[in-house]
């Protein structure tokens, strides 16, 4: 009989009694990890002090790398190696003060057998809350139980009690009483429209173009064809290298025409001459070529929406994609002709763009675009990061702040929009944003996500509000002043309810001219999704019936 050398299976260590193990998922980009490490270190120290005060020991699951200058897990491979050294049944806390790539720790968390808590610091300095929400959405999609908790420094009673509960029971449940299922809808014009558009989509189909899938480890942002196809939505898988190749075919003259159009529309470009730290005309020229190239490729493939990964694939190749993305999402935008000059592409309409190839946003943007257009509303839509927030004048006002672009109509027009160089920490080749302060008004917010093996959508109402200029600037300085900001007040949803429920780092927003119209649009959107077979959840205070 043949004898084979069998592998020696790894035996994880036993958990130490009354001990919590911690891990920290980070960025792939070394500059981001090094820059953010001091803030992460402070959060870990604050958390350790709280855990110790509650009578537990804390053991960090991986060492700080003095050569790299940080203590983050910075790749999927590194994460797998770290989890080999951790007791499988130990209580585990994922500590995040930064934007992190969920796939760095997903393999380990998926097979971990002990309770998992994801914590973040309540701060806008770096996107730790955004990182927490992305990991929460990814674990939800993976079907892995977990708990979440957030605090400024873990000295407050609310956070300490939450930590105590999790340490003693292995679970922590927050109030999500603001969420309820969709009741039967009345037979009105909005319901009829939503149902009709859903049936049209399912029957006639739509194509979303994906320029490289899986941006920045966002497992939650990948929706498999098996979930999309029953809605009538199909993917055209495209390569970012093809986008760069098409950019090279765009003439300088065509790109300059885009710049001239934007200058005439009143947009401000904050330019300089230092390529390493400032926005330059050369960077802008490249971005306008990307805008033209994206529309031409979309026309080639008959796309109904498009997403560009950018990070990581293009960040070392061309300037940021954000300016092109913001232009694509707006109705009024620089005209782009077919290669032979015979046709204007997607004339008089946006080409919905889903930032960071977030396919939950793709579905949502496609639905919103068709519905808002049919209702005669501005179909410009965008996603935002749920970055942070604080009370102002007796109301909790969220900072919704996507990393680079919104449609100009959300700012009140191009004359109220501006472009600044993207932060070098994330964008080594620069490129400009399409930024501004979102105009006050009524919005519908939403999020499509995967849970329990099927598609769900949360729908809610909010108001974009105006804050004094000094408060706006304070919030921008507390986060990323280069990026577009929306001051948002959710209707009937508290800060902690929203954090406990939301299953993604992103949410979608679209404007309506007044509250009554926004309520009608939400009702039609609920009917649209329900007819598609997506499970609809209503969040907060809504005027659902006419």
Q: Which residues make up each language-model segment?
A:
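Short, well-structured alpha-helical segments in soluble
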Residues: 75-90, 110, 292-300
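Cap/lid and interdomain-hinge subdomains that line or gate substrate/regulatory clefts
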Residues: 15-29, 55-59, 123-254
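N-terminal beta-loop-helix "entrance" segment that forms/cooperates
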Residues: 54-85, 245-255
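Extended, charge-rich low-complexity interaction segments
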Residues: 86-92, 153, 178-185, 190, ...
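Anaerobic metallocofactor- and corrinoid-dependent redox/one-carbon enzyme cores
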Residues: 3-24, 32-45, 97-99, 114-122, ...
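Flexible loop/turn segments at secondary-structure boundaries
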Residues: 29-31, 67-70, 101-104, 125-126, ...
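Low-complexity, highly charged intrinsically disordered N-terminal segments
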Residues: 29-62
């Amino acid at each position: 009989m043949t004898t084979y050398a069998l592998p020696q299976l790894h035996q994880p260590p036993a958990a130490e009694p009354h001990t919590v193990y911690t891990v920290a998922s980070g960025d792939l980009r070394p500059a981001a990890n090094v820059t953010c490490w001091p803030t992460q270190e402070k959060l870990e120290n604050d958390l350790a002090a709280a855990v110790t005060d509650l009578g537990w020991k804390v053991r960090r699951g991986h060492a700080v790398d003095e050569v790299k200058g940080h203590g983050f897990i910075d790749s999927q491979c590194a994460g797998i190696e770290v989890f080999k050294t951790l007791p499988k049944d130990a209580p585990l806390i994922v500590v995040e003060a930064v934007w992190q790539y969920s796939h760095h720790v997903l393999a380990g968390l998926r097979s971990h057998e002990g309770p998992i808590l994801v914590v973040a610091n309540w701060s806008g300095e770096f996107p730790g809350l955004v990182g927490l929400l992305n990991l929460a959405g990814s674990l939800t999609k993976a079907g892995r139980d977990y708990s979440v908790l957030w605090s400024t420094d873990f000295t407050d009673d609310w956070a300490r009690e939450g930590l105590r509960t999790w340490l003693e029971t292995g679970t922590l449940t927050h109030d999500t009483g603001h969420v309820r299922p969709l009741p039967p809808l009345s037979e009105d014009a909005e319901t009829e429209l939503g149902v009709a558009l859903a049936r049209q989509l399912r029957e006639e189909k739509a194509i979303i173009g994906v320029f490289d899938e899986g941006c920045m480890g966002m497992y939650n942002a990948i929706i498999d064809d098996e979930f999309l196809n029953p809605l009538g939505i199909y993917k055209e898988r495209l390569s970012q290298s093809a986008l760069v190749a098409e950019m090279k075919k765009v003439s300088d003259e065509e790109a300059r025409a885009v710049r001239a159009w934007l200058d005439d529309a009143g947009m401000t470009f904050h330019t300089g001459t230092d390529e390493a730290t400032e926005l330059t005309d050369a960077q802008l020229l490249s971005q306008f070529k990307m805008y033209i190239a994206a529309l031409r490729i979309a026309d080639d493939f008959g796309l109904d929406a498009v997403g560009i990964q950018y990070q990581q694939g293009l960040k070392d190749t061309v300037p940021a994609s954000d300016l092109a993305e913001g232009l694509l999402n707006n109705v009024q935008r620089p005209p782009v002709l077919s290669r032979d000059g015979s046709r204007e592409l997607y004339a008089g309409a946006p080409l919905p763009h889903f930032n960071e190839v977030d396919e939950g946003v793709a579905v949502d943007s496609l639905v919103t675009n068709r519905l808002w257009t049919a209702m005669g509303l501005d179909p410009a839509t965008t996603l935002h990061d749920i970055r942070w927030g604080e009370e102002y004048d007796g109301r909790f006002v969220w900072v919704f702040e996507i990393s680079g672009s919104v449609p100009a109509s959300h700012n009140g027009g191009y004359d109220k929009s501006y472009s600044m160089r993207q932060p070098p920490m994330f964008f080594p080749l620069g490129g400009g944003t399409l930024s501004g302060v979102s105009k006050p008004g009524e919005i519908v917010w939403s999020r499509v996500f995967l849970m329990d093996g099927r598609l769900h959508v949360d729908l809610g109402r909010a108001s974009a509000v105006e804050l004094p200029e000094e408060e706006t600037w304070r919030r921008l300085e507390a986060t990323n002043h280069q990026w577009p900001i929306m001051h948002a007040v959710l209707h009937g949803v508290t800060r902690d309810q929203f954090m406990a429920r939301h299953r993604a780092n992103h949410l979608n927003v679209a404007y309506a001219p007044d509250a009554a119209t926004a309520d009608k649009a939400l009702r039609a959107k609920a009917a649209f999704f329900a007819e598609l077979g997506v499970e609809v959840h209503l969040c907060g205070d809504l005027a659902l019936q006419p």
